[in-house]
Amino acid sequence: MKKMGYTPNTICFHTERVQFNTKELDFVRFLPNNLANKWKLMFYLNTSKVILVDNYYPELAAVSFKDGVECIQLWHANGALKQFGWEDNSISERSDADRKRFKAVYEHFLKVVVGSDEMGEIFKRSFLINESHLLKIGVPRTDVYFEESLQQQKRIEWRNKFHAENKKVILYAPTFRDNELAEAKLVMDFNAMERAFSEDYLLVLKLHPAVKIDVQSLNTDFIINVDKNVALEELLAAVDILITDYSSIPFEFALFERPIFFFSYDMEKYDKERGLIKNYQEIIPGPISQTTAELIEQIKTKTTSETLALFSKKWNKYSDGHASERMVVYMKQLMEEAK
């Protein structure tokens, strides 16, 4: 926004773990999204001309927008392997009051930003919206991956932090599971991974911020546990191999066209309880394993495949490094029309 000379009065409510360079963004007022600031959040939701959200916010259910106000859902991922919204399997277990609130929140999304036609179809089913709600301008969060000099800088920076030297970096970033709020259990056999790969690789572990586990016990010469609050976009340039399961990370990492493996040890259970997208096994751009032994063998025998490039092209169709610019142009137009 600032680069384009567009600096309207902007209020940003954020999770307290996120830090910003407030000096560079002097036109933005940053407020932690906590109980103490809840009344301010409600005030600005009711008085702003343009509202950007990136997740489900129950507060929207209590807001009645005036004519001309537009709430735009940016979402926090440019693709989805697990179901959400009305597609989430757990919806059937929620109360009538919950479902009424979900409906009220989703109806406030006048536009939803998408990076692909595939994700647009998922949003239509998940939020019960139609084609006119879709803003096909690309996903702003992917713009950084098209800045080659920045990505090269990040790769060098993080490899130095990892003391990678001549070793390659494997990132294991499992998705969040609802039962991990109390205590998480990592199924991967880290000893077996170390025996198999310690000569040529480092294993970087990146867990969801909500996961509770004694990570200090996992730090070895082979395993590096990254702080939960480190943003993934900071890390991906330094990664040579990604291991995940049902998270949205592959949709961004595919832009690098580097190998992705899916350690989906609880696939049937997860699909039953939470729900995976249809044809999950056909859509993902890499092999599935359900045991560490299978995973090790797959990594050892990996081959170059065109699947990754095709996957990235399909799911990042509208994301070309200029999505943020198009978003700013769109917001500027909305603000001018609202005068």
Describe each PLM feature range.
Residues 1-5, 126, 134-217, 289, ...:
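Conserved catalytic-core segment of nucleotide-activated headgroup transferases in glycan assembly
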Residues 1-149:
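Active-site and donor-binding regions of nucleotide-sugar-utilizing enzymes
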Residues 218, 248-315:
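Catalytic binding pocket for nucleotide-activated donors in carbohydrate/polymer assembly enzymes
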Residues 51-65, 70-75, 229-274:
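A donor-sugar binding/catalytic signature common to diverse glycosyltransferases
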Residues 10-13, 71-75, 172, 176, ...:
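Tryptophan-centric aromatic hotspots in well-structured domains and transmembrane helices
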Residues 32-48, 209-251:
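Donor nucleotide-activated moiety binding/catalytic core segment of transferases
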Residues 150, 292-339:
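C-terminal amphipathic helix plus adjacent low-complexity
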Residues 16-23, 120-122, 180, 210-216, ...:
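Short, charged/polar "capping" segments at the starts of alpha-helices
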